[in-house]
Amino acid sequence: MGKPTAKKKNPETPKDASGGGGGGGGKSGKTYHRSTSRVFDEDMEIFISRALELKEEGNKLFQKRDHEGAMLSFDKALKLLPKDHIDVAYLRTSMASCYMQMGLGEYPNAISECNLALEASPRYSKALVRRSRCYEALNKLDYAFRDARIVLNMEPGNVSANEIFDRVKKVLVDKGIDVDEMEKDFVDVQPVCAARLKKIVKERLRKSKKKKKSGGKDEELKSPKVVVVDKGDEAEGRNKPKEEKSDKSDIDGKIGGKREEKKTSFKSDKGQKKKSGGNKAGEERKVEDKVVVMDKEVIASEIVDGGGSKKEGATVTRTIKLVHGDDIRWAQLPLDSTVRLVRDVIRDRFPALRGFLIKYRDTEGDLVTITTTDELRLAASTHDKLGSLRLYIAEVNPDQEPTYDGMSNTESTDKVSKRLSSLADNGSVGEYVGSDKASGCFENWIFQFAQLFKNHVGFDSDSYVDLHDLGMKLYTEAMEDAVTGEDAQELFQIAADKFQEMGALALLNWGNVHMSKARKQVCIPEDASREAIIEAVEAAFVWTQNEYNKAAEKYEEAIKVKPDFYEALLALGQEQFEHAKLCWYHALKSKVDLESEASQEVLKLYNKAEDSMERGMQIWEEMEECRLNGISKLDKHKNMLRKLELDELFSEASEEETVEQTANMSSQINLLWGSLLYERSIVEYKLGLPTWDECLEVAVEKFELAGASATDIAVMVKNHCSSESALEGMGFKIDEIVQAWNEMYDAKRWQMGVPSFRLEPMFRRRAPKLHDILENVFSGPV
């Protein structure tokens, strides 16, 4: 990339205060200049050193994507450096890069920084490449083509310039533009040297002064006056003498066959002051000329309303806030901007929005939608009363976006941006207004031609629209009659019941997931110490208890959704049963008695589990009785759908499958209930409660209803912990024989082909191994 070249500055020796140029006066002036220059050089070294530190700090912030902080560091460095320093162009280009990273809306500011960089170093290729990228993004392809070509003239191997040049060239060719002719104009163009332009300006000034002296007062009055301001002095805040007025001089340069503006600014010598009592009108000032080759920036303030004048001048802008939820962005708009311009600026600031409404908050606090320019000006009139002007953006479907002053919703954003770019290039408001008028005439012509064509061929599209509207109206009326009828209410009730059952079933399955997670294995190394084992077991106990609580919560929510959902009641009963066993085995680590808190918690869980089992069993038996009598809710639904010929929506099992499934359901519920009572009898016996034998008797009854054999029941009773002939430990493992019964039923079911049902996964779920681990750890030898 090109390295910025520093400008050589020849400091002039200041004149003696007395105005003398000879002998001793010259000597004293020379001595004063040397001492002042030495102090100036020492201070400047400090400033330059600090500026370099700020430059490095800005580079680090840029790498961290803190673009605003980086620009602040670069700006501070620029204020410390002399204007002819070699790093000025680099800092300006770095600020342009920061603006480019902040979005398309900041590209005009990036172009401005590139222009300032090229003012400091006209052959700095990085600034040209950055500016070319900005022009390409803003659809100013001719300017992008020019800058890329200039860089390639200086550096044929510049990769970035080659990429931009090829892309822009391809787009221009697709648009039918003669790129070869443009390339011929730019092939030998080099950046204009600042020294050469300075010489041209001085020559023009000398000629204009001669014309003033010879032309007299009349010619002087006719010539236009301009006030020349030194931007460098204004930025540093130093005192400046009054600027002289001079004739407006233009420098015509041809780059690629196109004319560009060249702005000339003059800076007066700071070391010279006016004499208050002198007879002369004023001493002649020395002028340092600067020539800046700057392209017009594409900013929203350049686009003014159609009624504005065609004269070029500074457009008064207003700063507004664009509020989209929590995203608030600044924007600059002219005072007389139109609602279409505001729409385009919002699309540029929020490119992800496909459709939106523009709103403002009135004096009553309501958000009012803006659709016309008059409404926009009304919103601006509340600016003084309510503080800063805020425009609120509400995202909507593109079909719901309103038309803005005659513009259709389907107008392409690319076309709008091209129109704005073309307007900024031409700089003429009149042409923009003329294009709107031409567009209106063109639309009227299409409308008139369409009317003639329809009359000529006898084609009437309105009749089709009328037929469609009539058909939709009749269809809506018919649907309204069907929806409000008595039969529809019954169908709605069927649909509501099915959705209710579906929601409850989803919560049931959600709870089953947590029950499965509670069976997480405990990994204990073989050589682990007892302390490590207890620590691992305690962590597993906390995990399992949390999962049990989550499962119970989901089962209870399912019951709230569908109160007669017996599956959720049975699942809740099993969860409370397993939770009670977990708490009992965990309580064995300390001395267990009836008065302890752990014992009371275990008995409370057993009571809840029994209540849930009883309620679930009762609801299921009532539903089975209604089904057998033909008065169930499902039978009513089938009859209703059969009348409407929609009975195929329900799949019905055969009578044999229904009988087998009912028998299996009863067996599984009684088996689970018997296991619960058997385990409770063991707990009550250990706690010394006299009701343990009653629980054992009821458990035996439940096992008999479940279809267990007399031999298996006798083995269970014999191995109860209350029996003298029972095995050592906590008693017979009821879970093992229940699992054996389930496996026997599985084999039978596969032979008969009986379909499974919702609770079967719950009944098949094995007890967590954590129960055995807790029993072995806390009841074993210490």
Curated annotation (Swiss-Prot):
TPR repeats lie at residues 51-84, 89-124, 126-158, 444-478, 532-565, 590-623. Residues 215-271 have a biased composition (Basic and acidic residues). Keywords: Repeat, TPR repeat. SMART domains: PB1, TPR. CDD domains: PB1. InterPro entries: PB1-like (IPR053793), PB1_dom (IPR000270), PHOX1-4 (IPR044517), TPR-like_helical_dom_sf (IPR011990), TPR_rpt (IPR019734). Induction: Up-regulated by abscisic acid treatment, and by cold, osmotic and salt stress. It holds the Pfam family PB1. PROSITE patterns: PB1, TPR, TPR_REGION. It comes from the Eukaryota. Residues 1-33, 206-287 are annotated as: Disordered. Disruption phenotype: No clumped-chloroplasts phenotype. Phox1 and phox4 double mutants show no clumped-chloroplasts phenotype, but a 46% reduction in root hair growth. Phox1, phox3 and phox4 triple mutants and phox1, phox2, phox3 and phox4 quadruple mutants show a 70% reduction in root hair growth. Carboxylate clamp-type tetratricopeptide repeat protein that may act as a potential Hsp90/Hsp70 co-chaperone. Contributes to polar growth of root hairs. This is Protein PHOX4. The lineage of its organism: Eukaryota, Viridiplantae, Streptophyta, Embryophyta, Tracheophyta. The gene is PHOX4.
